[in-house]
């Protein structure tokens, strides 16, 4: 009985008949099968543990067309859960071919939405037979395959007869026309290649160390340049020099030596400093005004009966706050009841007709 796993995306709840339709298709195509279903988020977080090499087929159901990407960690988990030659199909992404191949899957030739876990290739062992037990002809005849060549060591007599100063080599007993010089040349070539590889790898490492020693941090150069005074680094041309050897304090009208830019920079720094000081002073004044206002609110002004008593300005010896009501409008306050009346003498009876109308 086949084991089938359904991985459901959380958006499956938008279509209540989608999962049932998939299960019906599985019953029609496979028949009797053991079907399990899990939410893919729970599998990714590790809340649901899946057994390795268990499922013959895993189907991913995702109705969200705009987001079908699968993390590489989930691909690896699905790969480990499938059996050999198992299939992972369904609503799979089509833009993650590299991740699919890196995980170990093979994309089906007939369907891009089907990934197959390949069966591992078994290694074939080739037995090596000892010298002297069987001849090459007997080995090839008995096994029906091409026999491996057998080698034997050259004797000292043959070396003396050949008067060769080369080291003792190996000869192939299965090949009659073996060229010993070719074998020695191949050995020397391999040794030479290995020596070249070692030399160049050592030289590359030394070059890397030298490059690291010669690297200068650019930030250090910037710090050093900032520590110097701008005026000390200024080069004044001959045309701007004063005859007595002194330097100009201000830049010329058409300055080209950089003194004008330095002055503008210093002026900008001074202006920013003044703005910051004025801003702090304004802020402190605002805070002080707020404190005074709060203090006045906590201590309201109260008038006594003496302050609220009415004063008769017609009686001699009694005056108002200004004491000039009898002199005329030019000497009267804004709220004086005698505004608009001619001047009068202290003690003179004054009638105010406008008050009667108001009453």
Curated annotation (Swiss-Prot):
Low complexity: bias regions: 155-166
Residue segments, region Fe-S binding site B: 322-336
UniProt GO molecular function: 2 iron, 2 sulfur cluster binding; 4 iron, 4 sulfur cluster binding; electron transfer activity; metal ion binding
Entry GO CC: cytosolic [4Fe-4S] assembly targeting complex; mitochondrial intermembrane space
Region (Disordered): 152-187
Binding site for [4Fe-4S] cluster: 322, 325, 333, 336
Family (UniProt): Belongs to the anamorsin family.
Domain comment in the entry: The C-terminal domain binds 2 Fe-S clusters but is otherwise mostly in an intrinsically disordered conformation.
Protein name: Fe-S cluster assembly protein DRE2
Organism: Scheffersomyces stipitis (strain ATCC 58785 / CBS 6054 / NBRC 10063 / NRRL Y-11545) (Yeast)
Gene behind this protein: DRE2
């Amino acid at each position: 009985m086949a084991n089938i796993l359904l991985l459901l995306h959380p958006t499956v709840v938008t279509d209540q008949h989608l999962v049932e339709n998939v299960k019906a298709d599985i019953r029609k195509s496979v028949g009797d099968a053991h079907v399990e279903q899990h939410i893919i988020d729970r599998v990714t977080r590790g809340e649901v543990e899946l057994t390795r090499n268990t499922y013959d087929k895993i189907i991913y159901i995702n109705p969200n067309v705009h987001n079908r990407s699968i993390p590489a960690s989930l691909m690896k988990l699905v790969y480990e859960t499938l059996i050999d030659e198992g299939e992972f199909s369904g609503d799979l992404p089509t833009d993650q071919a590299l991740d699919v191949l890196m995980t170990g899957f093979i994309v089906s030739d007939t369907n891009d939405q089907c990934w197959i876990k390949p069966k591992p290739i078994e290694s074939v062992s080739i037995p090596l037979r000892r010298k002297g037990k069987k001849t090459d002809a007997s080995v090839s005849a008995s096994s029906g395959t091409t026999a491996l060549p057998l080698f034997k060591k050259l004797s000292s007599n043959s070396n003396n007869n050949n008067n060769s100063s080369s080291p003792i080599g190996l000869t192939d007993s299965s090949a009659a026309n073996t060229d010993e010089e070719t074998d020695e040349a191949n050995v020397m070539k391999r040794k030479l290649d290995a020596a070249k590889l070692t030399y160049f790898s050592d030289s590359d490492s030394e070059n890397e160390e030298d490059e690291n020693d010669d690297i200068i941090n650019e930030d250090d150069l910037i710090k050093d340049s900032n520590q110097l005074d701008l005026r000390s680094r200024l080069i004044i041309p001959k045309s701007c020099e004063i005859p007595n050897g002194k330097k100009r304090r201000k830049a010329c009208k058409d300055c080209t030596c950089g003194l004008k830019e330095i002055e503008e920079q210093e002026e900008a720094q001074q202006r920013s400093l003044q703005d910051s000081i004025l801003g702090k002073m304004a802020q402190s004044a605002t805070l002080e005004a707020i404190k005074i206002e709060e203090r006045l609110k906590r201590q309201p002004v109260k008038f006594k009966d003496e302050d609220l008593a009415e004063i008769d300005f017609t009686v001699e010896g009694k005056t108002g706050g200004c004491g000039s009501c009898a002199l005329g409008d030019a000497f009267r306050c804004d709220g004086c009841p005698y505004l608009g009346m001619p001047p009068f003498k202290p003690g003179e009876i004054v009638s105010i007709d406008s008050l009667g109308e108001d009453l």
